[in-house]
Amino acid sequence: MKKISLLLMLSCVLSLQAQLRNNDVYEVTEMEQSRVRREIRIPNVDDYKVLKCDFHTHTVFSDGKVWPDTRVMEAWQEGLDAVAITDHIEYLPHKEIIKADLNESYKIAKKAADASGFIVIKGTEITRSKPLGHLNALFINDVMPMDVEDPLKAIDEAVRQGAFIMWNHPGWPDDKSTFYPVHEELIKAGKIHGLEVFNHMEYYPACFDWAM
């Protein structure tokens, strides 16, 4: 008798579920993008709280392939605490399709991040061929004044805005990590503050030694 009652209840539940389904549209929630976050545990140092951040990212507003809010979601899923949006100033391969102010990608990312309490850093990438190469300007206020022909003037504007300036991927694109005189001059002038030793799938051992 108990088995019959149990089967009857199960049949009723299945019937009810079938009735609740919309025959026109049924949402398959299992297909939603994962909201699982990977945990990266790094201990704090003395009284300083350690945050995990990606300081070099691009979106469709320069040569990236995703919308800015997707960069925020990716960073959160990877276990980071913050992400910098650093679209190129000069290299805009999608500019015929995406026409916007150079600050727009940050605005979109910031709106998405605020909804989840995530940190987004405003930045940009000053993009030139070697010997100068590419430099990220982080913690800036406005990208537009850096859109100038002379890259040294762009760097000066970034410094004026209180930026942290990072020399990006010194070993790219020629597979040679070369410390040029222009970098020595900028470092002595206090206009380069950091060095990227790993980018995408490349590690630059010589640059690690320079940084140390």
Identify the residue ranges that each predicted region occupies:
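Extracellular glycoside hydrolase catalytic/binding regions
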Residues: P170-W172
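Hydrophobic h-region of N-terminal signal peptides that target proteins for export
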Residues: M9-Q17
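A metal-dependent hydrolase metal-coordination microenvironment
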Residues: E32-Q161, N168, S177, P181-V182, ...
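Positively charged n-region of N-terminal signal peptides that target proteins for export
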Residues: M1-I4
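Generic secondary-structure boundary signal with a strong preference for alpha-helix termini
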Residues: L14-S15, P68, D174
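A periodicity- and composition-biased signal for non-globular, repetitive helical segments
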Residues: L8-M9, G64
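Cleaved targeting-peptide boundary
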Residues: Q19-Y26
